[in-house]
Amino acid sequence: MFKSSKFKGKKACVLGMGKSGLAAARLLAENGFSVLISDGGKREIPGNLHKNIEVETGGHTNKILDCGFIVKSPGISSNMPVLKKIKNKKIPIFSEIEISISFLPKGCRIFAVTGTNGKTTTTMLLSEILKQFIKNKEFNKNVFTVGNIGCPLAEVMSEIKQHDLIVMEVSSYQLEDSSYFKPYAATILNITPDHIDHHGSFKKYLDAKSKIFKFQTQKDIAVINSADKNCLKAAKNIKSKLYGFATTPLQQIRSHVFYDGDELVFSAGERISPPKLPGIHNVENAMAASLLALAAGVDSQSIQQAFNKFKTVEHRIELLGIKKGISFINDSKATNIDSTIIALRSMPDGKKTWLILGGQDKGSPYGVLLPLLETKCKKVLLVGQAAAKIKKDLPGYKYFNVCGTIDKAVEYAFNNAQKEDIILLSPACASFDQFNNFEERGKFFKQIYKSL
C-alpha cells in the first residue's frame, strides 16, 4: 500500500512514458517528489514537464536502482530484465491507480469495473446512472469516469473534491500491478481467456482479475456474473457483500437480478427496462451497472432515466450507417476472440456478414469461432499479422480472403456485397501491428466508410 508520507524525500521512478505514466509522474512531482521517467523506446519528450521530472528514453539505466519506489505503467511486461533487477534490490513497485488513490480527498468512493468484455459499456452506464442520481437528488458531488477507459485517475486528481464519486474501468494489467486496491463497489462481468501473451497463463490472468475484490471488507459491494464459472472462482473467498446477475435461466435462482426477455427483474421487486443496445451481452452490462448502483443506494427511477438516455459506446458494435443497402458496423474494440463472438451473435443468421478479422495475435486459439463463421458469415477477410495463424486454427473453414489491410478488406467487401449484407470490423486481435490503439483502428475504418 502506497503512503506518500512513508516515501517522503525518496525519488520516484515511473517506468513507461505512456498516458498513465506521464499522469502519475506529474501527480508525484506536484506533490513534492523528484521523479525519473524511464522509457525503453525512443519517444519524444513532452514539453512543459514539471521541474521535478527527469526523463530517459531509449533504454533503462541503473539510475532506476537508486530510486526509492517504482511506478510501473500497465503495459510493461513483468518479465522485463530491469524489473528483475528492481525486485532483486527489493525496491517497492506500485501501479498508477495505487499512487493516485493515495492522494484522493476524504470521503470519495470508488466504483470499479473489470471483465474480459463489456468493461467500457458498463463503466459508461454506471457513470450515467450516478450522474442522474446526483442530479435528481441535487447533491453537491461530481462523478469522474477514469482508468482503462482512456483517462488516468492521476490526470484529473486536481479536480476531485471530498465525497466525489470515481467510476473506474480497470484492466488485468492494472490489477496485476496493484499491491493494494480497495474499491467501495466492484464488478467482474465475465472472465474468458485473454492477454495470455502478457500474463503467461490463464491462471495468472484469473488471479489478476480476482484482485479487484481481494481487499474489500464487509462494508463493500461485489457484483458478479452468476453464470460465469470463472467469476464464481474469483469471488470464492471474498469478504464483501456479494450480488449476482444472470441471463441464463438455470442461474437465476442464485441471482439478485434476471432478464425476463423484456425487463430486468430484481429480487427486491424493482423492474427496469434495459438500454436500447444490441445483444444479450449489453443486457448483462446493464444488470451489472444497475446492481452496483442499487446496492450503493441509488433509486430505480434514476437508473431507468439514465438507461433511457444512453447511447452506444464508440467502437463497440457501432452502426456507422448504410451505403447501397450495405450496413457498416465498427467493432474495433473487439481485441479478443470472445468480443468477436459477442459481435457475431448480434448479427443476423443467413450468412450476410463480411467479417474483417485479424491484427496482432494475443495467443488465444481461433478455432472456437468456427460455428459462428459457418452460420453468420458470407466471407472472412483477413488482415494484419495474425492472418496466417487464423487460417491455421480454422482448417475446416474455406471462405477466407487475405486482404492484408482494412482498407483493402473494405474495398473487396463493398465491391462484392449485396443489399442487406453487413460489413463488420471485429478483429479479435490487438491493433498494434498497424495502429497505435483500437481507437485509431476504428477511426480509420470510419474514414474509409465516409469516403465510399
UniProtKB/Swiss-Prot annotation:
InterPro entries: Mur-like_cat_sf (IPR036565), Mur_ligase_C (IPR004101), Mur_ligase_C_dom_sf (IPR036615), Mur_ligase_cen (IPR013221), MurD (IPR005762). Keywords: ATP-binding, Cell cycle, Cell division, Cell shape, Cell wall biogenesis/degradation, Cytoplasm, Ligase, Nucleotide-binding, Peptidoglycan synthesis. Its main location: cytoplasm. It is an enzyme of class 6 (ligase). Pathway: Cell wall biogenesis; peptidoglycan biosynthesis. Its EC number is 6.3.2.9. It is found in: Cytoplasm. ATP binds at G115, T116, N117, G118, K119, T120, T121. It catalyses: UDP-N-acetyl-alpha-D-muramoyl-L-alanine + D-glutamate + ATP = UDP-N-acetyl-alpha-D-muramoyl-L-alanyl-D-glutamate + ADP + phosphate + H(+). SUPFAM superfamilies: MurCD N-terminal domain, MurD-like peptide ligases, catalytic domain, MurD-like peptide ligases, peptide-binding domain. One of its GO terms (cellular component) is cytoplasm. One of its GO terms (biological process) is cell wall organization. It comes from the Bacteria. GO terms for molecular function: ATP binding; UDP-N-acetylmuramoylalanine-D-glutamate ligase activity. Belongs to the MurCDEF family. Cell wall formation. Catalyzes the addition of glutamate to the nucleotide precursor UDP-N-acetylmuramoyl-L-alanine (UMA). HAMAP family: MurD. This is UDP-N-acetylmuramoylalanine--D-glutamate ligase. It comes from Elusimicrobium minutum (strain Pei191).
